[in-house]
Regions:
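Major-groove DNA-recognition helix of helix-turn-helix-type DNA-binding domains
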Residues: 2, 25-60, 81, 85-90
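Polyanion-binding surface elements
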Residues: 3-34, 69-72
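Residue-identity detector for glutamine
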Residues: 10, 55, 72-73, 83
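Helix N-cap / beta->alpha transition motif
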Residues: 18-19, 47, 62-65
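C-terminal structural segments of small proteins and small subunits
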Residues: 66-79
Length: 93
């Protein structure tokens, strides 16, 4: 729930964040087109919302989906760190 609240503050309460902003903020290493290809191929498990059925329609990510994706990535990182036998306690929020 904390991630969702942080995102709500970051995006001024927008329900759907434009894909270019999500790409700029969280996928800086990718272009918007490359991010779309990764989503369509299943490499990135992030639902893309289209405002209409048209291919040219505005695309975005629902804020709850982005929060869930970020939380899943954080959990995967914690799991990987634990498997590597990292020293120290892993903090969870």
């Amino acid at each position: 729930m904390k991630t969702l609240m942080i995102l709500m503050a970051q995006y001024d309460g927008l329900a759907v964040i434009p894909l270019d902003r999500v790409c700029r903020d969280y996928f800086r290493h990718l272009t918007v087109d490359k991010l779309l290809r990764k989503v369509m191929s299943g490499e990135v498990a992030l639902p893309i919302t289209r405002m209409e059925a048209s291919q040219k329609a505005a695309k975005g990510v629902h804020i709850a989906d982005l929060a869930a994706y970020l939380d899943q990535q954080a959990e995967a990182a914690r799991h990987e760190c634990a498997q590597l036998g990292s020293v120290g306690e892993i903090r969870t929020a």
